Amino acid sequence: MRNNKQKGFSLIELLIVVAIILIIAAIAIPNLLRSKMAANEASAVASLRTYNTVIVSYSTTYGTDPSLDFSYLGPATTPSSTAADLVDSLLGAANPSKSGYNFTYTPGAVSNGIISQYSINAGPQSSSTGQRYFFTDQSGVIRQTTNGNPASSSSTPIG
């Protein structure tokens, strides 16, 4: 008499397990992506706050705002007006990018050789890294848009 009892899983059982795993993944992955996007947006806001703070520090120390780009705030062996060592190399690059956001510094009006106004824009690198655009200026107020256009001084302040 032969024993036909085989040990293991049938194809149907394996397909059911795979289907359950796919259903769980379909539920979890969008939530993870939204969480990553929210973290990128929070990082962009924190970076704008950092820029506002270090521009005030730079202005107090050197008597002017950075004249061209963020590299003036960046790392240095010996701090100077062209490399103040106020931010890390990510934020101190000429055209910084951090956590899926690109930052743009625009110096404004010059009075007696001193820049009295500036603006900073933060825009997502793609729609998967963030949906909100941010703006700040010498007032320190951070503003946002969600319509796909860069934020400006007339945009809604963040809460």
Region roles according to the model:
Residues 31-48:
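Aliphatic-rich helix starts adjacent to a transmembrane/signal segment
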Residues 1-11:
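N-terminal leader/signal peptides at the extreme start of proteins
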Residues 148-152:
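A short acidic/small-residue loop/turn micro-motif
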Residues 24-27, 39, 61:
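Residue-level signal for short amphipathic helical patches enriched in basic/charged
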